[in-house]
């Protein structure tokens, strides 16, 4: 986004004698619920913190300093790449570092690696963390097959596992999932499309629904959300669903798919795009065809610079903002409890997510996303410092920024 959690699919691999569980091709929809999960602390009274405690100043993390002093072992963080989203190095790494340090961990107590898009590199990084005495691994896997293999090897060594940002289908028993409510992300995209069609006065909407990569569990949840919101409009004939081709997180592939669909169905006049990068690729195609602003809705997520600028330009209806500082703190807090041998409280682990491959309900820390338009851009992403005004408000967008009260 993503994605807000969006990446190129890599093949499943084996880790030692562990056979990777290729859960990527499951066609069963995955549902997220708000059922309370988690449990009471262990024999030592643990500090209590909730999924709604976190703020942009990271002050809540100081409540967990006792956990940092009680805990043992390394917390290893495995990030996926730098190509599918700028978020991992620009936001996840510094925010996770800040969260760990605010809770009292030293530089030798945690380690953050990026696999640069290579499943074999992530495997090597995981093995190194385990060898160095990791007690907890945060896994933001490139794909479910390789992620499941890493998690199986980790749990075999007694290492606790957290699925960070994306659920690993077929992952380890006993893990915790930390992410935004990804069905809600999809619902925001779907409602944003509806609102945009109305405000831009799109006549007889013929919508192309474009998904993320089907092997990414988040993409499944996003689609569950926006298709659920749009289905009544399709069912009553208000909108026409032109098609829903195979999904991708590769923008160039998304552009090609859109152009092929538009050639075959020139009546398409709106697109559901699941993230900002794919939307940007589609918008580039629209601009080549000289389609004017505020006539052809697209959607997105991740609140990327290009996405926000496309919203200001009137080519994108909005973008889902997932404040990564919330997700980083949720993951760091969960890791601190596990490292200290404590069960994270139910106020933190506030939901469950169904892993249909493992046929398991995974305790989850679910954080709340925000739909960003020109109406609230100043009070959300700009206020939080997620984007610099100097980067956002280039000369061509001076008037749009002024109208949006961004300064």
At which residue positions do the language-model features occur?
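C-terminal motif of bacterial Sec signal peptides marking the signal peptidase cleavage site
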Residues: 19-23
């Amino acid at each position: 986004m993503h994605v807000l959690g969006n990446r190129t699919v890599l093949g499943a691999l084996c880790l030692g004698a562990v056979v990777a569980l290729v859960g990527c091709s499951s066609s069963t929809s995955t549902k997220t619920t708000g059922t309370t999960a988690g449990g009471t602390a262990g024999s030592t009274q643990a500090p209590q913190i909730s999924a709604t405690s976190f703020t942009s100043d990271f002050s809540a993390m100081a409540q967990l300093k006792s956990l940092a002093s009680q805990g043992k072992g390394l917390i290893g963080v495995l990030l996926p790449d730098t190509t599918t989203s700028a978020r991992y190095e620009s936001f996840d790494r510094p925010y996770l570092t800040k969260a760990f340090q605010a809770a009292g961990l030293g530089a030798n107590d945690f380690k953050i690696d990026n696999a640069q898009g290579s499943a074999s590199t992530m495997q090597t990084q995981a093995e190194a963390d385990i060898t160095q005495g990791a007690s907890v691994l945060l896994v933001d896997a490139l794909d479910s097959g390789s992620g499941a293999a890493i998690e199986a090897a980790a749990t075999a060594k007694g290492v606790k596992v957290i699925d960070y940002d994306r659920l690993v289908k077929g992952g380890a028993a006993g893990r915790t999932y930390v992410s935004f409510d990804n069905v809600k992300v999809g619902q925001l995209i779907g409602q944003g499309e509806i609102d945009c069609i109305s405000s831009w006065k799109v006549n007889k909407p013929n919508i192309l629904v474009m998904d993320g990569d089907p092997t990414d569990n988040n993409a499944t949840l996003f689609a569950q959300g926006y298709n659920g919101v749009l289905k009544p409009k399709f069912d009553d004939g208000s909108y026409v669903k032109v098609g829903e081709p195979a999904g991708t997180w590769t923008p160039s592939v998304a552009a090609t798919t859109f152009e092929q669909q538009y050639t075959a169905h020139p009546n398409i006049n709106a697109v559901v795009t699941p993230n900002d990068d794919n939307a940007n690729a589609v918008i580039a195609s629209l601009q080549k065809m000289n389609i004017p602003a505020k006539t052809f809705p697209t959607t997105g997520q991740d609140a990327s610079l290009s996405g926000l600028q496309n919203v200001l330009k009137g080519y994108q209806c909005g973008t889902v903002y997932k404040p990564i500082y919330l997700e980083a703190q949720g993951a760091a807090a969960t890791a601190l409890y596990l490292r200290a041998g404590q069960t994270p409280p139910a106020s933190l682990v506030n939901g469950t997510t169904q892993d249909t491959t493992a046929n398991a309900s995974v305790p989850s820390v679910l954080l709340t996303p925000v739909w960003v338009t020109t109406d609230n851009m100043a009070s959300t992403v700009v206020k939080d410092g997620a984007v610099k005004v100097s980067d956002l408000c280039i000369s061509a967008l001076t008037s749009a920024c002024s109208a949006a009260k961004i300064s």
